[in-house]
Amino acid sequence: MRNITDTIEGIKELDICLYLEEHLQFYEFSMMEITTENGSVLKSEVNKTIHSTVLKKDYETYLIQLEVFDIEYKNRTVSLAEKDFLARIAEVNDDIILETDRHLNINKLVNQHQIQKRLEEKIERLAKSNVGPKVEEMFQYLRDFYSNDRRILLDIKNYRQHGLFLNPFYDSYTPLSIKKRSVRYLNFVENAVVNIGEEARVKKIKLKERELEVIVKGKMIAPFYNDMIFKSIKNKGILFDSAKDRPNLDKYDGSFIFDMNTGTVKKASISIEFSFGENYKKTISYQLNELNDADNN
């Protein structure tokens, strides 16, 4: 990635990976969802600050610590008590330590025991003011979830968590390379799964700024989930034409800008527009922006 020109023409191969011994950086993350149902609009937003510490152990191994600060929830349908409950649960994994290779493939979750201990402490505190069968069911679900490292890592790599930083686009590329993968979304339609096929390629290189951009496009796959979507839309009382209305991915665009000197992400975004007929629309935006020293002061 170091000895290249401002275009990707003539380049045989690009290897996007970490190039550093130690790196500390603050990021600003935001997620916004806008749902329109029968003309009614609901907006939900999450903002947080993330601090990353990347430390090289050896040629192939890195330790990455991700700490979350200042989480802010904006949702008019969620009470202050519910927001506080969600914030306390979110604190369980607001400090994670991962072992990865130089392409950010995760080898293991280093501090899983500490995360489980943190969960039990949160449950003990929350149980004093939150009671009932549903609360107990939630607590048990969380215990089961955080006892399974595979489920934790899948969640961590979700775009709404740390997926923009720990993105899957660290890889070797040629000018014609297209990297493909499948992503499952649970927030397009309530109680329904939507599968998206992502395709990524290198778009451009800015030699002066030492930046490389990978763009991502997406399309719906696995239509066998459509029955689940139809059922959820119907149960929500959303008006639609059963003869012609179908789930539709109107937009799925992503951009990942890498620092060519370090291999870390400088800026990343995913923009999604989904619809079902005229009366159900969902837009989702994920953004991660590197903060400079002036922003941190």
Predicted regions and their residues:
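Signature of exported/secreted
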Residues: 2-297
